[in-house]
Design a protein with these regions (language model features):
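Short, positively charged
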Residues: 1-244
């Protein structure tokens, strides 16, 4: 997208708008879209066009029984619906969870496989099913939006070249977030592999950033944006209809 290049935004187009097809009114003025220089400005045009019924994107989801059609990402309806309730930081597994109100949580971990140092991302876990994913790039984009530090992107190279410093950093997380003592940490050291180090390092760094936020409202806004982005409903996303 041209606007992405102008604003230097790295975003999956399906997270911006997951529409599978578009209905366009005859004579629609595409100049309204072409003239926009910012993502928020483009999103405003998309929303106005949807409300005018001149340009409508529709996302198709698997339907069971009946079907429902609903509008998504209409700005006036995007009130805060999730708040931060804490985190879960396992003593043994490579993942960590950001906990949100309503029983929702975002699991962050590497999904690249047992021997891979790639694929770190978050996945929204709801009461009934997984509800979307957010990779490290968009996670850092949202952190930057709030003026916060980002999760370093050098985890793989650090694991390969300096695993001792990686383990030392994770050990701080194990003591702070998992409440482990030194004997427990030393015992765990012999049981983990490179993939575990790669994943747990970034989990530790992300939770550290979130926990360092003292302003409760800011923290709530941040985690909700992570949740909304993963479920294609963030302020970076544009309006569409969802048929399911």
């Amino acid at each position: 997208m041209r606007v992405k290049r102008i604003e230097n935004v790295r975003m999956d187009i399906n997270k911006w708008n997951p529409s599978d097809f578009w209905m366009v009114q005859r004579g629609f003025n595409f100049g309204r879209i072409e003239g926009e220089q910012t993502l928020l400005g483009l999103n405003q045009v998309i929303q106005e066009s949807l409300q005018e019924k001149s340009l409508i994107g529709i996302s198709l989801k698997k339907m069971q029984g009946g079907a429902s059609l609903s509008r998504k990402n209409i700005a006036s309806n995007m009130n805060q619906s999730k708040t931060y309730t804490g985190f879960s930081y396992s003593r043994t597994s490579m993942d960590g969870y950001i906990l949100l109100s309503g029983g929702t949580k975002i699991q962050y971990r590497s999904f690249g496989g047992p021997s891979s140092l790639t694929g770190f991302q978050g996945e929204v876990k709801g009461a009934n099913a997984n509800q979307g994913k957010i990779s490290l790039g968009p996670t850092n984009m949202i952190l930057r939006t709030y003026g916060l530090p980002t999760v370093p992107i050098n985890a793989a190279s650090r694991v390969r070249t300096d695993p001792v410093s990686v383990w030392n950093e994770i050990s701080v997380g194990l003591r702070t977030y998992a409440r482990m003592n030194q004997n427990q940490i030393d015992t765990l050291r012999d049981k983990v592999n490179q993939s575990w180090l790669y994943s747990k390092l970034q989990v530790t760094q992300l939770i550290g950033i979130i926990e360092s936020i003292k302003n409760r409202n800011l923290r709530n806004q941040l985690v909700e944006d992570l949740y909304l982005y993963a479920s294609s409903q963030s302020r970076f996303s544009s309006a569409y209809y969802k048929l399911e």
